[in-house]
């Protein structure tokens, strides 16, 4: 199991990302629009820099839903390889069959 503090921190980051997503997207659109004057684009970049760091989507860490493990994460299943193997061997994941050849 991952530390609860690390899992909770990641949840707080997810919440911040969701909260600032629209504002961040609007500022990025202004900053990248080459038809606007340079000063206006620069202002948008400054406002973007003033937003909280944790409001950027790249700060989110994919974590296992079962254990909170941050590494060896399968995106489709939202779990780590360890949890996948454990739950799969008990037959708790629908459609997952042990390979044999």
UniProtKB/Swiss-Prot annotation:
GO molecular function: rRNA binding; structural constituent of ribosome
A GO BP annotation: translation
Pfam families membership: Ribosomal_S14 (PF00253)
UniProtKB keywords: Ribonucleoprotein, Ribosomal protein, RNA-binding, rRNA-binding
Record Gene3D superfamilies: 1.10.287.1480
PROSITE patterns according to UniProt: RIBOSOMAL_S14
Cellular component GO terms, alphabetical: cytoplasm; small ribosomal subunit
InterPro entries: Ribosomal_uS14, Ribosomal_uS14_bac/plastid, Ribosomal_uS14_CS
Entry keyword annotation includes RNA-binding: yes
Keyword Secreted: no
Oligomer and partners: Part of the 30S ribosomal subunit. Contacts proteins S3 and S10.
UniProt function note: Binds 16S rRNA, required for the assembly of 30S particles and may also be responsible for determining the conformation of the 16S rRNA at the A site.
Family assignment from sequence similarity: Belongs to the universal ribosomal protein uS14 family.
Protein name per Swiss-Prot or TrEMBL: Small ribosomal subunit protein uS14
Naturally occurring in which organism (per UniProt): Phenylobacterium zucineum (strain HLK1)
């Amino acid at each position: 199991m991952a530390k609860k503090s690390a899992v909770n921190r990641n949840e707080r980051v997810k919440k911040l990302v969701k909260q600032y997503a629209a504002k961040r997207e609007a500022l990025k659109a202004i900053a990248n629009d080459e038809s606007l004057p340079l000063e206006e684009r620069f202002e948008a970049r400054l406002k973007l820099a003033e937003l909280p760091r944790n409001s950027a989507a790249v700060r989110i860490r994919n974590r296992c839903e079962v254990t909170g493990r941050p590494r060896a994460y399968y995106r489709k299943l939202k779990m780590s390889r360890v949890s996948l193997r454990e739950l799969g061997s008990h037959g708790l994941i629908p459609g997952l069959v042990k390979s044999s050849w």
